[in-house]
Amino acid sequence: MANKKRSASSSRWLQEHFSDKYVQQAQKKGLRSRAWFKLDEIQQSDKLFKPGMTVVDLGAAPGGWSQYVVTQIGGSGRIIACDILPMDPIVGVDFLQGDFRDELVLKALLERVGESKVQVVMSDMAPNMSGTPAVDIPRSMYLVELALGMCRDVLAPGGSFLVKVFQGDGFDEYLREIRSLFTKVKIRKPDASRARSREVYIVATGRKL
């Protein structure tokens, strides 16, 4: 019975996915993923990216966000991206494949960033979802805490942090933590984000000294 339920749920997800207008637009435009449209909407409202910036992209695969940011920061900019999954190369993106939770991978990522601070840290990381909020939310909160830790390590004063968060236990505390570190914090729910999804995007700008 459980397998039948999973099969029906998977079929519904696939049907919803391929009928999604943003998935269809991404395919037509040759984009890596529908996430490109989420970031485009955030950029239109919050202007996070400018030419010449250095950006860290966590949870980068398949590359929708990196693909978008390249168009905003130009040839003088730089993107350092990381994901546990493989990602096809993108010109202008320095990609590291590995588990961000692993100390050796984190060390390698920090080495790629180097001594200079970055202007934006963005995270689209998410755990493998079980469908059970009591399991999924804590896993997600662990990842977003790691992303915030990366901000503390590499983000320049005045820099910005963009992170996908799933609303649930720990969300309010996490939001308070971000507000203590940044001068302006907004919550965005892009049109390309499915309405039934718990995901929202926290946009934090003006990292405090």
Swiss-Prot record:
Main location: cytoplasm
Cellular component, GO annotation: cytoplasm
Gene3D superfamilies the record matches: Vaccinia Virus protein VP39
UniProt xrefs under InterPro entries: RNA_methyltr_RlmE, RNA_MeTrfase_FtsJ_dom, rRNA-MeTfrase_E, rRNA_MeTrfase_gammaproteobac, SAM-dependent_MTases_sf
Leader peptide range in chain numbering: none
Major enzyme class: transferase
Annotated SUPFAM superfamilies: S-adenosyl-L-methionine-dependent methyltransferases (SSF53335)
Lineage: superkingdom: Bacteria
Record keywords: Cytoplasm, Methyltransferase, rRNA processing, S-adenosyl-L-methionine, Transferase
Database matches in Pfam families: FtsJ (PF01728)
Residues noted as binding S-adenosyl-L-methionine in the record, renumbered to the chain: G63, W65, D83, D99, D124
Reactions catalysed according to its record: uridine(2552) in 23S rRNA + S-adenosyl-L-methionine = 2'-O-methyluridine(2552) in 23S rRNA + S-adenosyl-L-homocysteine + H(+)
Compartments where located: Cytoplasm
GO molecular function per UniProt: rRNA (uridine-2'-O-)-methyltransferase activity
Record EC number: 2.1.1.166
Active site: K164
Function: Specifically methylates the uridine in position 2552 of 23S rRNA at the 2'-O position of the ribose in the fully assembled 50S ribosomal subunit.
Family per similarity comment: Belongs to the class I-like SAM-binding methyltransferase superfamily. RNA methyltransferase RlmE family.
Protein name as catalogued: Ribosomal RNA large subunit methyltransferase E
Species: Serratia proteamaculans (strain 568)
